[in-house]
């Protein structure tokens, strides 16, 4: 799905292998707060290796004696990885369950503490990643590329995981827009997200291709750093350009839905022109009831550090909720993901 999308720093020359072992992909979830210690929900921090999120949630539900829909999470995590993530168990008026029964060689309970709010999808600050890429080849320019990514970022593309194996989530969305009824709400949401993500990626790729990844267009919608507050100005000013250069504001692209575009003027015309070939997709998202939203055009990994040792690169960084680690890797090198006989279910994204 991402093969035709533009690269911010040009097509990478380096090659490597991602996830040769589960320990090569470590994700630690950061809620951004600590559970308060009281309330009818129990937040459970779990370390799991080679297990998917839904399976572990089912084990926790059985241990707590509750229905499986009483167990929630902030974001799906890759199966072939070592991940630390939080689960929420709704236990109103019930005593603390013995969750140790779910522990095994691949599952450890790290913490359990009550909280007064439900753990919902996206209810987190972000994720800390430590990746180990092996079998490096043609890596002479890798150090310079790492420096460029650290200072300029990468395209904030939705990763392959959003679209399903072979793009089957998009095929399902297309069928749904053509009139096929999807009764399962979760599947329907998945297909709508895939369609919306495809359109977003198309806008981002077009801006990069036109040399507009770091350049303001009249009417561009920008987002304040560290918040989801957005605004647009039809008349470009030196002050706004300076704020963009300093990182105080970020360029954004449309997440398509009902209502007026938040961008104006030339920026709105650009987005509409890019999406003109996707009119049926846009119409389908609007009829499904999704509203216009925005997402940053670029993604700048935080706390980024790395160690190059022969044919092995160890890379660490923090990404905000909703961002994809594989989008960082894609810009860095042509990484082949080791085949472990199952599809990775997600990429530590928070379910934008």
From Swiss-Prot:
GO terms for molecular function: RNA binding; tRNA pseudouridine(13) synthase activity. This is tRNA pseudouridine synthase D. Belongs to the pseudouridine synthase TruD family. Keywords: Isomerase, tRNA processing. The keyword tRNA processing applies. Its EC number is 5.4.99.27. It catalyses: uridine(13) in tRNA = pseudouridine(13) in tRNA. GO terms for biological process: tRNA pseudouridine synthesis. NCBIfam families: tRNA_TruD_broad. HAMAP family: TruD. The gene is truD. Residues 153-299 form the TRUD domain. Responsible for synthesis of pseudouridine from uracil-13 in transfer RNAs. It is an enzyme of class 5 (isomerase). PANTHER family: TRNA PSEUDOURIDINE SYNTHASE D. The active site is at 78 (nucleophile).
